[in-house]
Each structure stands twice: as C-alpha cells, then as structure tokens.
C-alpha cells in the first residue's frame, strides 16, 4: 500500500506564494550523482491530486528557496527568472527544492535550511548518492571540460568535494532521511517503484526518462538522449589509467573515516581501493 503523502499545512512558508503543496520534497546530493535524473523522475510521478509541479533548482542554503534558486521549472518547462509562472502549477502542486554539494543540516542546527519555512513545510528529505568510484570519475571528467581549470584547481575541487561526499554519506544515517542510490536507481525498476511507495507517490512513469541537461548532461556521453543509453556504472573503469584520477583515489584511500563511510554502502569500492591504503605515492623510494 502506498504511504500517505504528508501534505503541508495552511499558514506554512509556502502560503506567501499562494501555495499549499500536496507534497514538498527537499533533495540533496553532490554534483554528478544523478540528482537531476532522479528529480525528473520524481516530477513525472507527482502526488495524487497535485495541480502541477514546481522544481526550484540548486537553491542556496539558509535562504528562501523561491528567491535563491538558480533556475525554475514549472510543469516540466524551464521558466528562467520568471517567478510569477509558479502560478501555472496551481495552488496544490508537488514542489521539489534541490541543493547541490550540500548535506542536510544536522538535527541540532536549530533552524531549517529553508529560511522562512518550518520542518512541517517539507514532506520528505531525500539524499541522492552514487558509488564513490563512479561519482569521482564523473566529477573529474566534468572538471576537465572547463578550460580555465588547471590541474591544481581540479585537484583542489576534487579533494573538497570528496570531503563533502563523506559528510553526505554520514547524513544518510539521520532519522527521516530517504536515501536514493543512483547506481541502484538506474538498474532496477523495482527499486524505483519501492521508493515511490516510500515517498507516498503513485507509479505513473517509472522509466529512466531523457537525459537532463542541467549541469551539461552526462560527463562521458554527451550524445546520449535517454537514461537507458548510459553506462553510468562503468565510469571508473574508463578512468582507471588516468594519473590525475588515481592521485585523487590515493588521497581518499588514506582517509580511514571516509573509507568507513563508503564501505557502509559500497564495500566493493573500498575493496578496489585497498591496495592504495598506506601505499607510497610513487616519488622516489619508499623508506
């Protein structure tokens, strides 16, 4: 049986925008984790009785999500800066608020990440995450596409992102958080339908859908149009001979706390990193 949707209450933070969402979802995740593919799928399976859909993309933490979103999508169409177009979704839409490279706040933070809103204004908090090896390979590939980033810049971004990736995995143990593993989501229709049930959403369209062009689409397959065309579980294999990628993996392998967090969800990744643990990085002879 499908779980009941936690409809937001009148007088909530949404009221100032004339909204009383049927379902309001917060979605967190690192870039290159499949966030937008998952969000598009959620939007194609809105809560029963929804009058439309609103997607507030890449919002700024601790600010009003409507004011701080980087882009807006209403009823499946990008609306840019046209905030007034949210009215096209009706008064009881499904709303998704996304945060990139950001973990849900600690329960002891004392305030909601959405300024002007309360915990009751959110039906579910979701974290989209991806296997460490595939995620890190995809991120480095994406960074390579920026001509202004030299190797030191890429290395700095990689290491800071790896640190934040570990924090996000830790938040998956937080009560009330729904984790969506992109690797499993891509490969298993039953995994997807079970998640919809957990979120109180009907199964309307359980397909992977088209490639989303937020963030430039796939790092590896720019020509791919459909999610089923992607080999998302083999990214690390395509990068395993890349020296820059191996340097990032070597540094990550020396962090026992990170490895513990990764092993909880991706033990095969940690097994593959095992030879790097405590190894010499390769400059000169090991003492």
Regions found by a protein language model. Give the residues of each.
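PAPS-dependent sulfotransferase catalytic core
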Residues: 1-91
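Broad structural signal for hydrophobic residues in well-ordered alpha-helices, predominantly aliphatic
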Residues: 42, 116, 195, 261-262
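Residue-level marker of structural boundaries
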Residues: 47, 144-145, 282
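PAPS-dependent sulfotransferase catalytic domain
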Residues: 90, 95, 99-205, 219-233
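Extracellular glycan-modifying ectodomains
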Residues: 78-81, 167-169, 268-269
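Generic detection of long, well-ordered alpha-helical segments
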Residues: 32, 155-159, 189, 252, ...
